[in-house]
Amino acid sequence: MEDFVRQCFNPMIVELAEKAMKEYGEDLKIETNKFAAICTHLEVCFMYSDFHFINEQGESIVVELDDPNALLKHRFEIIEGRDRTMAWTVVNSICNTTGAEKPKFLPDLYDYKENRFIEIGVTRREVHIYYLEKANKIKSENTHIHIFSFTGEEMATKADYTLDEESRARIKTRLFTIRQEMANRGLWDSFVSPKEAKKQLKKDLKSQEQCAGLPTKVSRRTSPALRILEPMWMDSNRTAALRASFLKCPKK
């Protein structure tokens, strides 16, 4: 699974996932499923944010081509992917600036158009079950919840999906691709079932020595959102519109 993750995801996403696991004292060599899940969640958060801006009139627009228009403001503030100290600093700054209620748990994004924090979920199970788990944990009407599954299903607070259909379709397509690539490599069952994961871990550890000398193919393209992981007060400097960068898993 670890090899798959390093081949399938952008190196910057992998690096952020490694830092997150290290921060919580988790070993990615052992918790390989969690490593894959964190990378997937990070990518969905970045794809959610990519290309969405607010124009002078306060309208939400989607821009995919390079554009030096300095009057565009990023619609979403990315909180996920930062270390906890910086993440809470960003959240506090948003609350002080916008008057938003401070969430009990760290959210993933802040939507400047709808003036609300967003919790993104990616699940291998039924979307409604995961949604209820998130809602019961957060217990706040001020945090919007949006859940995606690997089967193309989604669920959001009050059926408000925030993004346009095309943007959501990109996310669903990416998740479906990840699932298919895992299945092609015999990893999907272990990703879904902890029991199968233990068996797969043993196989991975045995194969690592055999594959140690092999070259690894990775995509070097960087998601636009990864280039803008900085405090929200620097948002005014992030004026260039962004180019699409949807990563594909290399074939065996």
Curated annotation (Swiss-Prot):
Gene3D superfamilies: Influenza RNA-dependent RNA polymerase subunit PA, endonuclease domain (3.40.91.90). It comes from the Viruses. Its main location: host cell. Keywords: Decay of host mRNAs by virus, Eukaryotic host gene expression shutoff by virus, Host cytoplasm, Host gene expression shutoff by virus, Host mRNA suppression by virus, Host nucleus, Host-virus interaction. One of its GO terms (biological process) is viral RNA genome replication. It is found in: Host cytoplasm; Host nucleus. One of its GO terms (molecular function) is RNA binding. The active site is at residues 80, 108. The record marks 195, 198-199 as: Important for efficient shutoff activity and nuclear localization. The record marks 28, 65, 202-203, 206 as: Important for efficient shutoff activity. InterPro entries: PA/PA-X, PA/PA-X_sf. Plays a major role in the shutoff of the host protein expression by cleaving mRNAs probably via an endonuclease activity. This host shutoff allows the virus to escape from the host antiviral response. Hijacks host RNA splicing machinery to selectively target host RNAs containing introns for destruction. This may explain the preferential degradation of RNAs that have undergone co- or post-transcriptional processing. Belongs to the influenza viruses PA-X family. The probable endonuclease active site in the N-terminus and the basic amino acid cluster in the C-terminus are important for the shutoff activity. The C-terminus acts as a nuclear localization signal. The C-terminus is recruited to host protein complexes involved in nuclear Pol II RNA processing. This is Protein PA-X. It comes from Influenza A virus (strain A/England/878/1969 H3N2).
